[in-house]
């Protein structure tokens, strides 16, 4: 079933409310201390007070819900059933990755995403749970980056986690234009996001624990790690030239 505008409006209002809440809780620049001011500008986190509150709430949800679910999946779920489930979830991201690869002018990755999507289903039905083609993950935030848009201020989104102003608008864009979202019911999109979150969390349980244990400031460590990972994703692990927006 296609989404209608009335289905989407509540999400617009929710995002507007969250953004306004962040804007009313901006950090105050330390204007009298040059070193502190340099650190403040480097962090590019003017919404830090609000971001830290959201971060604390996200950590609580993770510890109460997501982490226990991910541990159960990792330790108790039958290993032979994990590959087909994880590959099915991954393949549901390929149409969006195909779209953004085209928008970025990357025909090679567009072909990889399309090939992965269209060959995975028949091979899955024939019993091959490990497709030969590697997945490609692209999103609107990466497309905006390739078009030359800067990251902008750091933003911590409820439940979604670390983001930037650019990637926040990208998340909204993907919600509207995700091909899977347009041709399926909302529960399918929610199920994909939930399943992906559980699988990803099950793969980094020990790493997250180490980061929490060894970080003087867990929030700042997550912020730094997120930015490094996003830069790597934008470059696809290498150097990506900036393309003009169409």
Q: Could you tell me what each predicted segment is?
A:
Residues 27-30:
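Bacterial signal peptide processing site
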Residues 2-15:
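Bacterial N-terminal signal peptides that target proteins for export
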Residues 88-165:
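Mid-length scaffold segments of soluble, non-membrane domains
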Residues 64, 70-81:
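Membrane interface segments of multi-pass transport proteins and intramembrane proteases
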Residues 34-64:
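Post-signal peptide N-terminal segment of mature Sec-exported envelope proteins
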Residues 22-25:
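C-terminal motif of bacterial Sec signal peptides marking the signal peptidase cleavage site
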């Amino acid at each position: 079933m296609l989404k209608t505008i009335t289905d989407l409006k509540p999400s617009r209002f929710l995002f507007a409310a969250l953004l306004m809440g962040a804007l009313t809780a901006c950090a105050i620049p330390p204007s009298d201390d040059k070193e502190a001011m340099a650190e403040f500008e480097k962090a590019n986190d003017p919404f830090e007070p609000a971001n830290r509150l959201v971060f604390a709430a996200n950590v609580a949800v993770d510890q109460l819900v997501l982490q226990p679910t991910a541990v159960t999946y990792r330790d108790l779920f039958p290993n032979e059933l994990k590959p087909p489930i994880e590959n099915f979830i991954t393949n549901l991201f390929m149409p969006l990755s195909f779209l953004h690869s085209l928008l970025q002018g990357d025909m090679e990755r567009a072909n990889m995403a399309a090939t992965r999507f269209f060959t995975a289903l028949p091979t899955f039905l024939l019993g091959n749970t490990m497709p030969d083609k590697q997945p490609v993950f692209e999103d609107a935030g990466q497309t905006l980056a390739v078009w030359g848009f800067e990251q902008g201020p750091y933003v911590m989104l409820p439940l979604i986690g670390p983001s930037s102003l650019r990637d926040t608008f990208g998340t909204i864009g993907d919600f509207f234009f995700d091909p899977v979202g347009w041709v399926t019911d909302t529960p399918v999109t929610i199920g994909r996001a939930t399943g992906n979150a559980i699988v990803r969390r099950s793969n980094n349980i020990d790493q997250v624990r180490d980061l929490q244990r060894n970080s003087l400031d867990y929030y700042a460590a997550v912020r730094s790690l997120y930015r490094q990972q996003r830069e790597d994703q934008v470059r696809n692990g290498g150097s990506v030239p900036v393309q003009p927006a169409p």
